[in-house]
Amino acid sequence: MDKKSARIRRAARARHMMREQGVTRLVIHRTPRHIYAQVIAPNGSEVLAAASTVEKVISEQVKYTGNKDAAAVVGKVVAERALAKGVKDVAFDRSGFKYHGRVQTLADAAREAGLQF
């Protein structure tokens, strides 16, 4: 089993549990150059809020889009957008990535901005 398939297996297991519980999810995805975050409805078919370093508004605020500073900005923005839609409680779906570095920074910034998980 290679690294990518192991990550996808971990993500599938976590998503299965969240789907059974019927909770709103804060889903992240990271690449070496960008980080993405979405708040997905419990039914899994609707994106309630989203933010990523691809957006011009966010990429203008940071020098480089693939570091912790960029992840913190994305976490803050996605939390603000979710709160504007009335979503306060979410489950953190790290998509099989380790809770370390940019993933942890995004989560901490979202918590500081008002999301609870």
UniProtKB/Swiss-Prot annotation:
Transmembrane intervals: none
Per the record, the GO terms for biological process are: translation
Coiled coil ranges (UniProt) are none
The keyword rRNA-binding is annotated on this UniProt entry: yes
Q: Which InterPro entries match?
A: Ribosomal_uL18_bac-type, Ribosomal_uL18_bac/euk
| Pfam families referenced in this protein's UniProt entry, alphabetically | Ribosomal_L18p
Provide a Gene Ontology MF annotation, just one: structural constituent of ribosome
Q: What keywords appear on the UniProt entry?
A: Ribonucleoprotein, Ribosomal protein, RNA-binding, rRNA-binding
Q: What GO terms fall under cellular component here?
A: cytosolic large ribosomal subunit
Q: Which PANTHER family match?
A: 39S RIBOSOMAL PROTEIN L18, MITOCHONDRIAL, LARGE RIBOSOMAL SUBUNIT PROTEIN UL18M
Family indicated by similarity:
Belongs to the universal ribosomal protein uL18 family.
Subunit (UniProt): Part of the 50S ribosomal subunit; part of the 5S rRNA/L5/L18/L25 subcomplex. Contacts the 5S and 23S rRNAs.
NCBIfam families, per database record: L18_bact
**What is this protein's function?**
This is one of the proteins that bind and probably mediate the attachment of the 5S RNA into the large ribosomal subunit, where it forms part of the central protuberance.
The name under which this protein is listed is: Large ribosomal subunit protein uL18
Q: Which organism's genome codes for this protein?
A: Pasteurella multocida (strain Pm70)
